[in-house]
Regions:
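Non-catalytic, conserved peripheral segments adjacent to functional cores
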Residues: 3-189, 208-212, 217-249
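Short beta-strand His + acidic residue motifs that chelate non-heme Fe in jelly-roll/DSBH
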Residues: 162-163, 193, 201-206
Length: 249
């Protein structure tokens, strides 16, 4: 390192030098990136979940699976969601009872929300959820899809960041943060996502275009099945001067 490099910030004031911070350009492990800065959804869809290092960071019950998007020259694109008799949903025995669509404007976000797990009365929440997702995770017939809301999400336009946090009792509170591409951005990040009840999830629009998503739910929508957590980001408050004016009598 040259003398010049050692005194690189000599031209700044003392206060400015104290305030300086350096960006960390190191690429962390998958576990670090998944919980902090986020990873491409395609990396998760391609991951071998049988490996211990993947199992240790994956939220039980979450599914992230690749979708094929076919460009049709001079027309647009064509993409499949799911097939009833093959793929992830067929494997886990989940077929939505309701399908819906949503549009999120650019620069907007959907705050954390969560759906309540259905717990049989003869057992505790901790024991039941550990049985479903730790002790007997391949026994999909145990899952009470008709009594709790599971979400299946697809993005057909734009780019979005999804953040999941497991808040189920009896399970580790893991975090999964990843980026999904809509069908108009053909890439390995064109995926479908399954979110179990008890896993809080938030969505933030990336970039300058609106996000359009299509999602299915294992039950018909019921307002009491949706709990909000840290969702203040959804409220666009009026300017203070407007609020003062409206409060005048």
């Amino acid at each position: 390192m040259s003398k010049r490099e050692k005194n690189l910030w000599a031209g700044l004031s003392g206060a400015a030098r104290k305030a300086l911070a350096a960006r960390d350009y190191k690429v962390g492990s998958l576990a670090q990136r998944l919980a902090r800065s986020g990873v491409d959804a395609g990396e998760l869809a391609a991951a071998d979940r049988r490996k211990p290092e993947i199992k240790s960071i994956w939220i039980p019950g979450v599914e992230i699976f690749a979708r094929a998007i076919y460009p049709q020259r001079h027309r647009g694109v064509f993409g499949e969601f799911v097939r009833h008799d093959e793929g992830i949903l067929a494997k886990i025995g989940l077929w939505p009872k309701q399908w819906s669509a949503a549009r999120m404007f650019a620069q907007s976000a959907k705050g954390f929300h969560v759906h309540p797990p259905s717990i049989p009365p003869e057992t505790s929440a901790e024991k039941w959820q550990r049985r479903l997702f730790v002790t007997d995770p391949q026994n999909y017939s145990l899952r009470p899809y008709d009594d709790e809301q599971w979400d299946v999400m697809f993005f057909v336009q734009g780019r979005a960041e999804m953040i999941l946090r497991d808040v189920r009792s009896g399970l580790p509170g893991r975090i999964m943060r990843f980026f999904v591409d809509g069908d108009n951005h053909r890439s390995a990040n064109n995926v479908g996502i399954v979110v179990p009840p008890g896993v809080a999830h938030a969505i933030r629009v990336e970039g300058s275009e609106d996000v359009i998503m299509v999602y299915g739910t294992s039950t018909s929508f019921r307002p009491e099945f949706e709990g909000r957590i840290a969702s203040e980001i959804e409220s666009a408050g009026l300017p203070e001067s407007w609020q003062r004016f409206l409060g005048e009598r």
